[in-house]
Amino acid sequence: LKDDFKLNIELKNSVVPYEGMEEKILELIYSRGLQNSIVYSSFSALSIERIRALDKDAATGILDGRVSDCLYKLKGGCGANALHPNWGEMDLPPEKLTGYTVRAWSGGRMFPEKPAGGRLDLAALERKGITDVFLNEPERYL
């Protein structure tokens, strides 16, 4: 991966908890030497807690729709070091997000479906307090 790009791994376990998922994923990532290129995210605060307990240096983010819900989970003690809201659900003023890493996502199309065709206005997102974005089509921004 390029130095300024990270790969987000979303742990899809907020409805059904998969025993040992976090351990297996960390083992796989470390076996390939990719630990510095990965961000782990989940809607499950417990899953983020487990990742952080297993690897205190792991980059993690708590997912939710609204940024206020992400912040609520973070302050609940999940140990995430970033907020991962939907980019269209920035319901707090940017000054409330000062000091936080805010990696926003969208529900855009996934490869190999037809490309979305547009580009996000990254400057406008930054003005809302977003520091990073998850993209299904990162090649459009290179």
Give the predicted meaning of each segment.
Residues 3-142:
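Short loop-to-alpha-helix "cap/lid" segments that border enzyme active sites
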